[in-house]
């Protein structure tokens, strides 16, 4: 088995996206919320590295995370453009959810811990302690992680259509650098009666 570092891509279909999940991806959090989420087991978000997080906006532009329109709003606006009614927000175990199509696909891109963090921080000494004593406010973001994100964004734009990317957020405040990409899965289908094509939002997976 090869020991070469490998990249990772995980994806999951969702019925919708809520404000809480969107806020986490876009880090629309204040200091108090960081403290609250860090009380949960297996969670740690370093607020002193929050300044390193970023998003890729339309055109492949790097900008501060959370400065663009909330993802849940972009989701509704894009569906309106397509003439598709958004699913109501329901819990996964709700029987009604089984009848709904997946209107969101959430991707997470990451890779080998050492490689990802080298791209993000270079040779800077980052303190990964989880006891709240770390101060990484002086750490700077490396260009390599930005280029990695832009390359991913370009690939997804070509594959799914840039207009269907409603969120592309890179997190450098956790253990390993990673990216959350949120897309609306649009396919064109031909109506049997009219022969006309119409957009359908659906992902089976």
Q: Where are the model-predicted features located?
A:
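N-terminal nicking endonuclease/strand-transfer module with a His-rich metal-binding environment
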Residues: 1-205
